Amino acid sequence: DNIEDYLNPPKDDATTSASYDNAIYDLTVTDYAKNINDWQFAKMDSYFKNNPSLGLSVKDSLQLGFYYKQLKAPTDTTTFRADSTFYINYTGKLLNGLVFDTTDEKTAKDNGIYSASRKYKPVPVKWAKDYTDIKLDGSTVVKGFALTISQMRAYEKGVGIFYSELGYSYSGQGKSIPGYAPLIFEIELVAKPEEN
């Protein structure tokens, strides 16, 4: 192969012409980082400064890259017994406000992520002694989500904010969560939903 073959592909061979398709991309670098964790901490610091009602700063971390703020006090501060099951409503979003998941139908509709095939209702959480063993509707969750739940007690409402090492890391998740994205989860412990 040489440059002439690449620039002038055969015109009569339909099987090879697709591999010679050209594409032009116009890219703009909007931000860069020498250290991705420092970049995420700076983004979270900016979020805290732009949302002063949270009353958080980067100095308030409970663990590297993890922040929790109680929004409504619990009715009981007793720690859950291992293997207890309780129910939560939650909304997950990015620092820019993009909602990517929720158990609330109105929130889903308001943010363009509603799916008629999904049931919007509180979901069960299985408590565990070690937060990494907490399960949501029988499935494992990212560490930051589990850490947020581990801070909570009966009927409490709170928000967990954490860097990507406690979320989806470099890979992101689906089309909504890019790699290295700090995440926000607003979670409320609620009563078990009525069976229909």
Specify the residue positions occupied by each region the protein language model found.
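Cross-family detector of peptidyl-prolyl cis-trans isomerase
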Residues: 1-196
